[in-house]
């Protein structure tokens, strides 16, 4: 009977494969050199609809093409975070020997996965002092970078290159090489398009699905397939039930052996389905020095996070779920499923996990060394406490909003957006973390009905009142984060007066009464710098829109990103701001400018509903962590 069940399952698999054969023929995972690849990569002998990046595997070292019929680059390494490091060997050889002549004809395709830097190749007669440069030996010219707009660049020619090409050395001297990395981020609907037999194509900055298996003429084929599967499933259930009755006594006698087999199959299931490494409990116990208190990074609502170093030398953050949390397995599986389907530079990377039948449930993340945004804004007795300049705060807001917009485009709601879940790397780049409460929102529904969960001070009042979770719930929480960034105040502070314990209530009250200056942190230069005053007031206005009680009045995260980038453009145009030293150069204020002038055209609700209503939920995430996932 077991053989019959296996054969029936295999038959169903063949039926499903045949239904999509016309769309997926020739598209499969493959090995190229020493690396394994899958979509969005494809081999030269595969159809172009199989991916976005073509790989040539005919030589020992694979090569990649960034655009159709474009130049071939050598692949140096591939990481689990969808980052691929490549090199232009001919140009690199030229640069290594000190020749820069090939740079003049160098160009890269327009790509959202590359950060570009502008180099200036200048005649030695136009030599620049005080800025980093790399000599172009014997060619009568030198190579410079970090030249500001206010410097004379006559006798120089600009060259666009990847940021990673310039490697600082001693003093002002730098090395230039032709090695760079691509961090590839695709929305979830692009992967679904590929899995449905379609071709995901890039059109400007968006992606379009062509030829997915959803045409009306497939109706009868899908009907026949559905009937076949339905009948076969019923037959399989009957056979499995009979098999269970016959072998019940055998299972009781050999329970311990079956338990070991189940653990093995669970590990294999995790490796195959989620495609992430499985760590043993002993390895992570050793990596964290037996979960030493000295390695403690933070305590959260669902677990404790420890610093560790695994066998291959990588620094990691190990999340140890609380044993008393009856939902820990659900949160464990939920976070793995979500993080393995997402790839974005501003989302924390999941390196692996233990088996779900392990002694303890442990999740292994990349280690983010610079703490959380909350640490830097108002943390006490933390190693990361320090002042964030206005330009840094605006950049943090944009990167966080971009990550949330990417989640929403992939039909995922974070549900626990807060400053303790926004981590900062060495360069103060954002990494959004903690997906234990995240939910998948099907594209054909407007909301999901679920009991409110989250952190007090950040929870959408409409979600709390109506039990309707939408992507606008994340928008509300992000509005609180925006207010924290401009005010340097925590989301909840019981030392404030009762009506202003929640920062959202305080912000709405100040903005409606044209008292934004009382809300904004004066250390940012609000009183002395016109540009800072204008931009912080504009962010306050955007936060006010995000905090509307009626979620239909709130913007989408995509609109929030657009508005924040527009504000950043104002910063770049402002002549009163010195970006290198973060110093303020005051100028006289125009007579028609001020927070009242900026906000006077906003249509504020007369009496917004306060979100300070007390409520109790055992499922909430307490705001107690300095490093919380």
UniProtKB/Swiss-Prot annotation:
Disulfide bridge positions per record: none
InterPro entries (alphabetical): Kinase-like_dom_sf (IPR011009), Prot_kinase_dom (IPR000719), Protein_kinase_ATP_BS (IPR017441), Ser-Thr/Tyr_kinase_cat_dom (IPR001245), Ser/Thr_kinase_AS (IPR008271), WAK_GUB (IPR025287)
Xref: SUPFAM superfamilies: Protein kinase-like (PK-like)
Glycosylation sites noted in the Swiss-Prot or TrEMBL record: 56, 92, 123-124, 172, 177
Membrane topology according to the record: Single-pass type I membrane protein
Location, primary (coarse class): membrane
Keyword Cytoplasm part of the UniProt annotation: no
PTM annotation (Phosphotyrosine): residues: 365, 463
Organism superkingdom: Eukaryota
Catalytic activity: L-seryl-[protein] + ATP = O-phospho-L-seryl-[protein] + ADP + H(+); L-threonyl-[protein] + ATP = O-phospho-L-threonyl-[protein] + ADP + H(+)
Active site: 416
Catalytic activity, EC: 2.7.11.1
Family annotation (PANTHER family): LEAF RUST 10 DISEASE-RESISTANCE LOCUS RECEPTOR-LIKE PROTEIN KINASE-LIKE 1.1, LEAF RUST 10 DISEASE-RESISTANCE LOCUS RECEPTOR-LIKE PROTEIN KINASE-LIKE 1.4
Protein name: LEAF RUST 10 DISEASE-RESISTANCE LOCUS RECEPTOR-LIKE PROTEIN KINASE-like 1.1
Gene expressing this chain: LRK10L-1.1
